Amino acid sequence: MMLHIPGVLTKAQVAQCRELLDAAEWIDGNATSGTQSAQAKRNRQLPEGAPAARAVGDAIQDALARHPLFFSAALPLKVFPPLFNRYEGGETFGTHVDNAIRLLRGTDFRVRSDLSATLFLEEPDAYDGGELCVEDTYGTHRAKLPAGDLVLYPASSLHHVTPVTRGERVASFFWIQSMVRDDGDRTLLFQLDTQIQALSAEKGAKDPMVISLTGIYHNLLRKWADA
């Protein structure tokens, strides 16, 4: 499942984040690449330990913790600290799949990458190209979202970023270890939760059907979750 999550950051928050990021020093994006990715990656990246990366990353994680749609879809157990990249002048990232395990350098913090996320930090009309293209059994899905919006997709997916031929594409990217490892199970829970929320808004939280379906949701979560 590929999901557009709008409004993770407000426009004002995006502007504050960009002020910090634009003043920072960027390096070759292959500093964090695996063997496969290094063959395809042509972009720049903010060093993981840079003060701007930590400050903006903390702001993003705070925003994610308050976003009900993100929680419902991802059921996050651990979130890898957000990283940041930028593309311009034909830079691109060819087709690849993300590493299954991400290790935070200098620590014992590890994340199984169940989900990948890209948070856009530049408006789509400010650059040409730069689409995130995610492949699955149903074809190729493209994302080029407003600044502050996020796209969430299975980390097992082949994906690439098309060349940026005008302007500059700036984004944050990170990985989530979900409480529910299996993408199919997680998708079913998300669909069920979405319907429960809609039914609750229509009939009220005390409606017997809402209570029954909520119980089913939590029993399935109890069965499938690793917490």
Swiss-Prot record:
Q: What is its EC number?
A: 1.14.11.-
Q: Which positions are annotated as binding 2-oxoglutarate?
A: R169
User: What is the species of this protein?
Assistant: Burkholderia lata (strain ATCC 17760 / DSM 23089 / LMG 22485 / NCIMB 9086 / R18194 / 383)
Q: What is this protein called?
A: PKHD-type hydroxylase Bcep18194_B0892
Q: Which Gene3D superfamilies match?
A: q2cbj1_9rhob like domain, Rabenosyn, Rab binding domain
Superkingdom of origin:
Bacteria
Show where the Fe2OG dioxygenase domain sits. Answer: 78-178
Q: Which GO terms describe its molecular function?
A: 2-oxoglutarate-dependent dioxygenase activity; iron ion binding; L-ascorbic acid binding
Gene Ontology biological process terms from the UniProt entry:
DNA damage response; intracellular iron ion homeostasis
Query: What cofactors does this protein use?
Result: Fe(2+); L-ascorbate
